[in-house]
Amino acid sequence: MLIKNAFVFGEDKTFSKRNIAFSDGLFSDTDCNCSQEQSFDASGLYAIPGLVDIHFHGCMGHDFCDGTPEAIHHLATYEASVGVTSICPATMTVSEENLTQVMQSARTYNEAELPSEEAAFAGINMEGPFISESKKGAQASEHIRRCDSAFFEKLQHTSGGLIKLVDI
């Protein structure tokens, strides 16, 4: 496939009008011998790397802390529709029971066959409960805890190793 006339973000951190060829899952900046049906005129459009969202709680009426694979499906589908290719949704500072449910639902979601129209699930951003009371922002005070490696390990095990970021 050949994408023609796109404004491509380059190594020099500027956009320039270029063609992008790709085949067998690999991109190239050299033209291919593609048929007209295998080319796309991207005049006036920008080609950028896929975006990675490492901190968001929810969207479109769904929240990561809803604790269901279905909620994650809605988050991943929406994020992909706006150019995000990978997500690392953030928890809130919630009860141990709720956090455990969130971790289990993330594991269940991640182990399922995922539709190609969803952003990839890169992991979990655990925003709390190990945060400072003085820097809590919108986090619930009643669920803030001191750092606890045993509790973290329990959650990490429940998630199947998906916790990638921990806010403290």
Model-derived features: where do they sit?
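Short secondary-structure boundary/capping elements
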Residues: 43, 67-71, 144-151
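Histidine/acidic residue-rich metal-binding segments in metalloenzymes
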Residues: 109, 146-168
